[in-house]
Curated annotation (Swiss-Prot):
A Pfam family this chain is assigned to: Ribosomal_L35p
Taxonomy of the source species: Bacteria, Bacillati, Bacillota, Bacilli, Bacillales
Gene: rpmI
Protein name per its UniProtKB record: Large ribosomal subunit protein bL35
Region (Disordered) residue spans: 1-48
Keywords: Ribonucleoprotein, Ribosomal protein
Organism: Geobacillus sp. (strain WCH70)
Family: Belongs to the bacterial ribosomal protein bL35 family.
PANTHER family named among the record's database cross-references: 54S RIBOSOMAL PROTEIN BL35M, LARGE RIBOSOMAL SUBUNIT PROTEIN BL35M
GO biological-process terms attached to the record: translation
Keyword Hydrolase (UniProt): no
């Protein structure tokens, strides 16, 4: 059986933390900023963790990621 491959699209979007959780960036950060408040834009800058409901599915895509 061939080796499992890391999903390269997912690998570019998620990083593993030291404790094994997954860090991700926010959506809605590429354009249309004129109709977002300064507070919204500020909160979107900071990275956040993947929710527990999505973690298992994303972990399968990134199985071989260090």
């Amino acid at each position: 059986m061939p080796k499992m491959k890391t999903h390269r699209g997912a690998a570019k979007r998620f990083k593993k933390t030291g404790t094994g959780k997954l860090k991700r960036g926010h959506a809605y950060t590429s354009h249309l900023f004129a109709n977002k408040t300064q507070k919204q834009k500020r909160k979107l800058r900071k990275a956040t963790l993947v929710s527990p409901g999505d973690f298992k599915r994303i972990r399968q895509l990134l199985d071989n990621l260090k």
